[in-house]
């Protein structure tokens, strides 16, 4: 990495003149033809640039000059000594409106300064070159930190946004960081984006990175910004609909100026490698009746090695894609006549039902009672619960006898009716109601993605109605439940406690008491957990659980959420032990698998189609050595079928024995039972596994018994343990 010198209070790098490529380009008058891109059938850089770029830049430069003058005056008049506290408790002397986080980082070590992506001042992310304003705490975040990654990818999105304006000339919309990388949406009057354009876009991005364009932050009045962005109706919508303050911020890099809260990296040169890898179309703010936008996705890293690792990871993820494996293994499919609703074929249905049986077996041990509730409810139910006001767009609704009804998108309101259908006593609490009811959510067709984003699904949904003082024990039970299930799957997980948000409903004392009980439960649970302050729902604190799959991806499936508001909305009460008949229960919303469909997608990709024996839709393949053993092979298969195994036979006369065994291994049959004349005479089978481990000859009865044991214990390595 290049060594950089400390910045001056203005944010410029001492001894290094920031490159303003846009000014140089404008001086050229657009007479030189761009050499970037276009040679592979894709688009090339526009020449000249769209007029709005020059107009916007002229306006910005005037505002920036005024801002710099005001800042210099403020630094001269109002600057005073301040104390900056570092994470180790050490305090550093600084000057308000002059000293920047970057200067402090340089004072510690140049290596630290070079590797810092962004600062965190008083727990808020902050530009490295933005002067500090008062006494504060300071953290210096490297790329490994999640918040730093978000900033790094956000800055990369601006680089790509600049390239998109210079290539397409359209109107930029939103360009956020996402879980792995970033995207930018653009509205084009004509035409669209092609993957053939990626090369010219990447070439231009590399040029922008090489220029080390400084990221500049500027606070501007809303009405001025409406004038600056009058060419772009989408930015004007954001200003009019989302900005409720007199001023907001824009950021500039080169000729790009965009509405943005920031912060950003110091300059574009901090992005060491950038790849554009995907494009799609979408609607403005996801609404099907709004304009169609072009979306381009990218990824970037501070080290080319990380990009190579990412590309390798993408290839592995592609090979594990549940949609491909589902097709290849004949587990499930989708059809245009019912978008977002999966058709589970017999072998896929086996996985689905086995997962539900697993959860049901745990319900019996843990005191849950399974219920069945309606699929369709009058809209009055959803008005009472509050979902109609906030969620009706995502519900399938229709008229019945002049009244509005809807398919249920969740089970909790129906469970509230169950609790309320007769008087309840403290003796009945905790009441644990479980429901595998079918749910429907009206997802946009463009958002539907295999089994991970569907319209029709089922959850291992449960609601615990309990007294306030029972919360701690119930949460302990929920945590133990999820550990039991996830250990069977081989998932590790991480836990976050999300506490009271700024805009919460209810009594603060109830919140404090509940949060304390959640903390106690987590501490006793014994697994590492982190506090996520202020990130709870408005109606109660929650525990967020993320599982980690075989290739290192995290997925949120389980839910443990306290709810103080739904019992109030439905006026749920019980008679307490001291005779108070207005006592209010607390609801614990709880799921372990979450959506069964989504969990099947995760498990498919986690195992790469190599299902563990207990869950496998192809547990046993019986292979006869020749046609004279076909009848015996069918008899053996029937014995395994009767013992409730997923068993098949390969009677194909056109295949050799070795070919049949290889086919069974490729189809991921856990156990392959070869039968010849010897086995036929002695009532035995010769056992090998899909990984070609040979277990030798056993009687059919002995084999059935052993496989039943392995199935009942849900062994992760049944083939080895046999």
From Swiss-Prot:
- Positions bearing N6-acetyllysine: 242
Keyword terms: Acetylation, Aminoacyl-tRNA synthetase, ATP-binding, Cytoplasm, Ligase, Nucleotide-binding, Phosphoprotein, Protein biosynthesis, Ubl conjugation
- Result for mutant: residue 158 to A: Impairs post-transfer editing activity but no effect on aminoacylation activity
Is Ligase one of the keywords? yes
List the InterPro entries. aa-tRNA-synt_IIb, aa-tRNA-synth_II, aa-tRNA-synth_II/BPL/LPL, Anticodon-bd, Anticodon-bd_dom_sf, Beta-grasp_dom_sf, TGS, TGS-like
Q: What is this protein called?
A: Threonine--tRNA ligase 1, cytoplasmic
Function per UniProt: Catalyzes the attachment of threonine to tRNA(Thr) in a two-step reaction: threonine is first activated by ATP to form Thr-AMP and then transferred to the acceptor end of tRNA(Thr). Also edits incorrectly charged tRNA(Thr) via its editing domain, at the post-transfer stage.
* PANTHER family reported for this sequence: THREONINE--TRNA LIGASE 1, CYTOPLASMIC, THREONINE-TRNA LIGASE
* EC code(s) of this entry: 6.1.1.3
Q: What is the lineage of its organism?
A: Eukaryota, Metazoa, Chordata, Craniata, Vertebrata
* Location of the region described as Disordered in the Swiss-Prot/TrEMBL record: 1-48
Q: Please list the GO biological process terms of this entry.
A: threonyl-tRNA aminoacylation
- An example Gene Ontology cellular component term from the record? cytoplasm
The primary location reported for this protein is: cytoplasm
Q: Where is the signal peptide?
A: none
Gene3D superfamilies recorded: 3.10.20.30, Anticodon-binding domain, Bira Bifunctional Protein, Domain 2, Threonyl-trna Synthetase, Chain A, domain 2
Biased segments, Basic and acidic residues type:
13-27
Q: What is the effect of changing residue 154 to A?
A: Impairs post-transfer editing activity but no effect on aminoacylation activity
Catalytic reactions on record: tRNA(Thr) + L-threonine + ATP = L-threonyl-tRNA(Thr) + AMP + diphosphate + H(+)
User: What PTM annotation applies here?
Assistant: ISGylated.
Q: How does it assemble?
A: Homodimer.
Q: Where in the cell is it found?
A: Cytoplasm
Family indicated by similarity: Belongs to the class-II aminoacyl-tRNA synthetase family.
**Compositional bias of type Polar residues: which residue ranges?**
1-10
- GO function term, MF aspect, one: ATP binding
List Phosphotyrosine occurrences by residue.
297
- Pfam name, any one: tRNA_SAD
């Amino acid at each position: 990495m290049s060594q950089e010198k400390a910045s001056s209070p203005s944010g410029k790098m001492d001894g290094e003149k920031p490159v303003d490529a846009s000014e140089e380009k404008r001086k050229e008058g657009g007479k030189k033809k761009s050499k970037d891109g276009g040679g592979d059938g894709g688009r090339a850089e526009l020449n000249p640039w769209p007029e709005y770029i020059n107009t916007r830049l002229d306006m910005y430069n005037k505002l920036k000059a005024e801002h710099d003058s005001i800042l210099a005056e403020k630094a001269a008049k109002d600057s005073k000594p301040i104390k900056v506290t570092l994470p180790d408790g050490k305090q550093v002397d600084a000057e308000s409106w002059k000293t920047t986080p970057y200067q402090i980082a340089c004072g510690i070590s140049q290596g630290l300064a070079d590797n810092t992506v962004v600062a965190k001042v008083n727990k808020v992310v902050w530009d490295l070159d933005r002067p500090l304003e008062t006494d504060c705490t300071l953290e210096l975040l490297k790329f490994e930190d999640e918040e730093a990654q978000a900033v790094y990818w956000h800055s990369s999105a601006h680089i790509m946004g600049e390239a998109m304006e210079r290539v397409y000339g359209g109107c930029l919309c939103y360009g956020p960081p996402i879980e792995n990388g970033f995207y930018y949406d653009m509205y084009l009057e004509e035409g669209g984006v092609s993957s053939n354009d990626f090369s010219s876009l990447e070439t231009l991005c590399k040029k922008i990175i090489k220029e080390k364009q400084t990221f500049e932050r500027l606070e501007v009045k809303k009405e001025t910004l409406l004038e600056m962005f009058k060419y772009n109706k989408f930015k004007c919508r954001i200003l009019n609909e989302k900005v409720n303050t007199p001023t907001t911020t824009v950021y500039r890099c080169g000729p790009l100026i965009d509405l943005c809260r920031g912060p950003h990296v110091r300059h574009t040169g901090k992005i060491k490698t950038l790849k554009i890898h995907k494009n799609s179309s979408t609607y403005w703010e996801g609404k099907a009746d709004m304009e169609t936008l072009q979306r381009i996705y990218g990824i970037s890293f501070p080290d080319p090695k990380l990009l190579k690792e990412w590309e390798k990871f993408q290839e592995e993820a592609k090979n594990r894609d549940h949609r491909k494996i589902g097709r290849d293994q004949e587990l499930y499919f989708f059809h245009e006549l019912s978008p977002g609703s999966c058709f589970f074929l017999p072998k896929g249905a086996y996985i689905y039902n086995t997962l539900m049986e697993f959860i049901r077996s745990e319900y019996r041990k843990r005191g849950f009672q399974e219920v069945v509730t309606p699929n369709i409810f009058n809209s009055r139910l959803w008005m009472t619960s509050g979902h109609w006001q906030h969620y009706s767009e995502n519900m399938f609704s229709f008229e019945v006898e002049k009244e509005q009804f809807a398919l249920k998108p969740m089970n909790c309101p129906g469970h509230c009716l169950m609790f309320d259908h007769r008087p309840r006593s403290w003796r009945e609490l905790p009441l644990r109601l479980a429901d595998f009811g079918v749910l429907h959510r009206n997802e946009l067709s463009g958002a539907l993605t295999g089994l991970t984003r569907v319209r029709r699904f089922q959850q291992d949904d449960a609601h615990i109605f309990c007294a306030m003082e029972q919360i701690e024990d119930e949460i302990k039970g929920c945590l133990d439940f999820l550990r039991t299930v996830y250990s069977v799957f081989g998932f590790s997980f991480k836990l976050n406690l999300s506490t009271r948000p700024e805009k919460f409903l209810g009594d603060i004392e109830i919140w404090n008491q509940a949060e304390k009980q959640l903390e106690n439960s987590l501490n006793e649970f014994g697994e590492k957990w982190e506090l996520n302050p202020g990130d709870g729902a408005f109606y109660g604190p929650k525990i967020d659980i993320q599982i980690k799959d075989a290739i290192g991806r995290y997925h949120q499936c389980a839910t443990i959420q306290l709810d103080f508001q739904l019992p109030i909305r439905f006026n749920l009460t019980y008679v307490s032990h001291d005779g108070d008949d207005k006592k209010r229960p607390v609801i614990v919303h709880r799921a372990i698998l979450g959506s069964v469909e989504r969990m099947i997608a995760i498990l498919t990709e986690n195992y790469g189609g190599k299902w563990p024996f207990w869950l496998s839709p192809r547990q046993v393949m019986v292979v006869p050595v020749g046609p004279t053993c076909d009848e015996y092979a069918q008899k053996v298969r029937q014995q395994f079928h009767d013992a409730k195994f997923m068993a098949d036979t390969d009677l194909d006369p056109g295949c050799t024995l070795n070919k049949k065994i290889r086919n069974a291994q490729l189809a991921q049959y856990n156990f392959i039972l070869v039968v010849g004349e010897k086995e036929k005479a002695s009532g035995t089978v010769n056992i090998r596994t899909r990984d070609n481990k040979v277990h030798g000859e056993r009687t059919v009865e002995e084999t059935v018994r052993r496989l039943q044991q392995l199935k009942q214990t849900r062994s992760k390595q049944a083939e080895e343990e046999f």
